[in-house]
């Protein structure tokens, strides 16, 4: 049976509640003519729910269907829980609808690893391209980099998001191999260099969208 948009939102918002979102964007950008929304430092998130979610962001996963089986993660493939996946169009339209109703000030987007890191990031990029390009969304976007994603895709993600971050789950390579056998130390740390580089170039690129 096909899931409704509300069913997907309920599942994927709940699955995102353990992902850490910073409340300060570090970005300052006024609205441009013809765009919707703006982004001002020190960020657009100031109210929190009891479980740590920032209530002025739509904090959601692209999907909670994961190819990995990390023992600490609620979305691991061996866990028996409801699964859902947004299409890029569904999530972009949902974000805009919430924004127009003044429910949110921006989007926090993360994802489980569907098929592969690159495939997952391509779908996240499709959402951001719709928001920035077709819908002229100028609000705050925080995207989570998926470990193992190619540098080229991370660079594109950096052009479109105000903030990029990556989860570093464990302090040692031995612990990582025990608890997250599908991940490697280098796949986690590798995204950090492109993140800092792409941030410097992102705002210039956005001017031409």
Predicted region positions:
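Flexible, acidic/Gly-rich N-terminal and inter-domain linker regions that tether
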Residues: 1-65
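Short Fe-S-cluster ligation motifs
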Residues: 98-110
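Conserved glycine-rich "GG(E/T)P / GGGxP" loop and the immediately following alpha-helix
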Residues: 107-126, 178
